[in-house]
Amino acid sequence: MSIFRLSRTFSLETCLKSSSFKIRWRFFSVSYASRKLASEDNKPSIQEVVRGIPQNRVRNWAVIAHIDHGKSTLSDCILKLTGVINEHNFRNQFLDKLEVERRRGITVKAQTCSMIYYYHGQSYLLNLIDTPGHVDFRAEVMHSLAACEGCILLVDASQGIQAQTLSNFYMAFSQNLVIIPVLNKVDLPTADVDRTLIQVQQTFDIPMSKPILVSSKTGKNVEQILPEIIQKIPPPKGSENAPLRCLLIDSWYNSYQGVIGLVRIMEGFIKKGGKVMSVNTGRKYEVQQVGIMYPDMTEVSRLRAGQVGYIIWNMKNIDEAIVGDTYSTIGSNVEALPGFSIPQSMVYVGAFPLDGSDYERLNDNIEQLALNDRAINVQKENSSALGMGWRLGFLGTLHLSVFIDRLKDEYGKELLITSPTVPYRIKYKNGREEVISNPNLFPTNHQGISELLEPTVDATIITPSEYLGDVIKLCESCRGLQKDCTYMSESRCMIKYQLPLAHLVEDFFGRLKGTTSGFATLDYEESDYVPADLVRLSIFMSGKSVDALCSIVHRSLALQRGREWIQRLKPLVPKQLYEVILQAVIDNRVVARESISALRKNVTAKCYGGDVTRKQKLLNKQKEGKKRLKSVGNVSIDKSVFYEFLTKKQSN
């Protein structure tokens, strides 16, 4: 009995103590939560923080590197480090907003993000621009660097300096930007930090006594980058009290808000309700909203000199947003800023809807994509075989491929794309010159022509030295002209060739990767037009030219290509009621021929016997009918045949 009372007493006391502890803990929790909420209420908003940062604590900088050297991964680390993104909203390649970018693992569009960084007790506004690494998107890099005072040059410690590393360095150097080299992927077993440091110092003449060695994958030493940016990259120039001058560096279209512009404020300020005008065109707009990318569109009260942000300005016509244009306050007499040179298209294709009824809608979709990528050249054209379509110009084959993917991802549309061609120049004896980007306009009769010229590129190839001989053979087979060959180290060399652009379009990069087991890198820039022996290769069906299959080739390749195309096309063309003749024609001369037999119909099936002349009469009647049909009829070819043929040819 006593044991029972003791246990009851102990249990009661324990419960009372526990209840008292719980009451006290709950009171403490409520009190702590109240203080925490109060502190959060007192915490200034991002708009207030940005408004309080003076111009001398603003830094505009970009990340440039060769493709796949870790630019986007490094940007992710820096955004997490500064608190712009956290574990809840984080995803890999955070700034890569396009589906094609995340699927392919490459950056296509330069993306901007602002961040707040506290250094030595002061807040800094850091505007980061993540740039593409592929040569086809060089224009994006150029536009991005125009908005910066400095950049991070990222180099893969396992691969060293690559072709696009050189190109991006000289692009930044030509704009007098502060360049901070950073070695990435130092945690890899294949990383050779010492060798890469020597390469950077010797190639770029940059002292590497205190190198920044990071791993964007693990986050190692990434925190060392931001203090370097603050200390070495100067703040932007320009007075907030001066008349407004802002540079349009990018634009995109929103169905509800119209054209949205990304601008760098060079002088003055801009705010909601302001009236601005284009210095070049004189068109006027009312500003509906201004803000920064943090990381998404975040409205602020005003954008001041030195800042990078977006403007919603009631612009409905997508043709009015000209990248590189200068905007100022209405009534201000200011000088236009140096704009951007429009990049010249290097690859042209014919594009046609698979369904003719989609033409108008596709036209709107293509114009909206062209607004977001001014390097795309769009012209309408008509094909007798494929109907209404467009002649599209791109900076390269990857640029073309990304455009096709974006059209499918963002609008659910597909196009029938003809063979890529390059712009050729024709000089006539009377002094006139003409540039031809459509093969159907290339003359078959060379009378009156003094010279035919094709575009070339200056290609820079960096390859392991053991593949040097194979690379030279590949370039020579593409009619290349060697310009230089230097050894960067005992194991790597850099070779420069002048190559016909037409060969570069025809999967030269893929062949280069196959020749060097994927170790070679390629960069190129536009070079001169040189004389070439060019001919037009036409495909005829039953005596009529098929304009969708026309191309311009060098005479040395024309015969082989004509035979290949005819043999590949033959099994795809459906049989007709009469024989169909396929011909490859060069300079009005047939160089390859195939025939597709007619559909057979047994017209004598009902004749079971009797005079043989009855059967002969029916056969002759059928023969005359086929002859008459052949003389007046057209070969009916569905678009799916062209789609299959062109798709196979491009994949090969």
Swiss-Prot record:
Native organism taxonomy: Eukaryota, Fungi, Dikarya, Ascomycota, Taphrinomycotina
The protein's name: Translation factor guf1, mitochondrial
InterPro entries: EF-4, EFG_III/V, EFG_V-like, EFTu-like_2, G_TR_CS, LepA_C_sf, LepA_CTD, LepA_IV
Mitochondrion among keywords: yes
Transit peptide: 1-44
Record's signal peptide: none
Alphabetized GO MF terms: GTP binding; GTPase activity; mitochondrial ribosome binding; translation elongation factor activity
Provenance organism: Schizosaccharomyces pombe (strain 972 / ATCC 24843) (Fission yeast)
Membrane in keyword set: yes
